Amino acid sequence: MANVVVVGTQWGDEGKGKIVDWLSERADIIVRYQGGHNAGHTLVVNGVNYKLSLLPSGLVRGKLSIIGNGVVVDPHHFVVELKKLRDQGVKIVPEILRIAENAPLILSLHRDLDAIRESGFSGLKIGTTKRGIGPAYEDKVGRRAIRVMDLAEANTLMAKIKRLLRHHNALRRGMGVAEIDSQALYDELMQVADEILPFMDCTWRLLDESYRMGKHVLFEGAQGALLDNDFGTYPYVTSSNTVAGQACTGSGMGPGAIHYVLGIAKAYTTRVGEGPFPTEQINDIGEFLGIRGHEFGVVTGRKRRCGWFDAVLVRQMVTICGVQGIALTKLDVLDGLDEIKVCVGYELDGKRIDYLPSSMGAQSRVKPIYETLEGWKQATAHALKWEDLPVQAIKYIRYIEELIGTQVALLSTSPEREDTILITDPFAN
């Protein structure tokens, strides 16, 4: 069996939560390796909905779950989400949940800064969740972050807070916002220290020991590769690296420990927030996909923008992430359409290209080139075998495989975990 990385190949919301939940039965350990509580997902287990945004999906199944060093942790949200799951009957104890001691913390001042920028102060509206993710990563890179381990060292914490506030209070003065008192921030952290410290661990050592014992690890990505800070639609991206390579740097496991990369893609495309979206359908088709697919954000409730499947973008992320197989989700949303379009290339300034350029200007000018396929009337919803699928749906899947350059390894035909068709087992490689 192998260690598997799960990564979104679009702009997030691809259905990673269900796929991770389905794969978790084959894994011993589930690891979150980037992002924060800005990207949520819903698990449906025995008819019960579990909404997660920070905690790893494996907790619902009682699996050892790790929040890696690549994640920014809001300690107050951690406490809230922990309580919510416990209230739903999920047993969460330190034996099955560990948090990297060197994971940076999201503080109230990060949320403040995020909200101020999104209000238009910065002159660029990205469409963030205003949860402080970006500012927390800025402090990490700026070498001034407060990390989980700092909560255990109260005697040195105040000095670190004062160093952090020298930066943030200067920003706040410039924006005309009241400065933060160091003692108030210290008290804020001490209020949650006892809640989070029992889960703290040197997680890279735990993972290394587990790997040497033959344990199988599932790396759970958040958001999607098209939101990657380097390879996404910059500047309309998130503040972390969301590509598969981040599984190593965000967990402390080396590249040699990764054996299979499973990309997740919807059978169409969605996006939340601002930024380019070549195949967006601002028409009846877009409305149909949004309503049928229940396309509203788990964290924010925002309506998602919807469009046709963009094979150019998915192929690009398949290449960058080293994807060996795709889990194709929400095929059932397309049931009943007379015809289905797939973007197979772009036109940019009169020339055909087969990739999305990096510049914002070029991204805004690309025009999608479509191929039109026949739709299907027979339902794919709740199909459990390949043989249950309509012929035209199979043709659609095969065409996508041809365009993106990799196989469909799993097929999801409803939000229920049981409605999954396994074609190639990622853990068997």
Curated annotation (Swiss-Prot):
Binds 1 Mg(2+) ion per subunit. Its cofactor is Mg(2+). It is found in: Cytoplasm. InterPro entries: Adenylosuccin_syn_GTP-bd (IPR018220), Adenylosuccin_syn_Lys_AS (IPR033128), Adenylosuccinate_synth_dom1 (IPR042109), Adenylosuccinate_synth_dom2 (IPR042110), Adenylosuccinate_synth_dom3 (IPR042111), Adenylosuccinate_synthetase (IPR001114), P-loop_NTPase (IPR027417). CDD domains: AdSS. Mg(2+) binds at D13, G40. It comes from the Bacteria. Pathway: Purine metabolism; AMP biosynthesis via de novo pathway; AMP from IMP: step 1/2. The keyword Electron transport does not apply. It catalyses: IMP + L-aspartate + GTP = N(6)-(1,2-dicarboxyethyl)-AMP + GDP + phosphate + 2 H(+). One of its GO terms (molecular function) is GTP binding. The active site is at D13, H41. Substrate binds at V298, V299, T300, G301, R302, K303, R304. Keywords: Cytoplasm, GTP-binding, Ligase, Magnesium, Metal-binding, Nucleotide-binding, Purine biosynthesis. Its EC number is 6.3.4.4. IMP binds at D13, E14, G15, K16, N38, A39, G40, H41, T129, R143, Q223, T238, R302. It holds the Pfam family Adenylsucc_synt. GO terms for cellular component: cytoplasm. SUPFAM superfamilies: P-loop containing nucleoside triphosphate hydrolases (SSF52540). One of its GO terms (biological process) is IMP metabolic process. GTP binds at residues 12-18, 40-42, 304, 330-332, 412-414. Homodimer. Plays an important role in the de novo pathway of purine nucleotide biosynthesis. Catalyzes the first committed step in the biosynthesis of AMP from IMP. Belongs to the adenylosuccinate synthetase family. This is Adenylosuccinate synthetase. The lineage of its organism: Bacteria, Pseudomonadati, Pseudomonadota, Alphaproteobacteria, Hyphomicrobiales. The gene is purA.
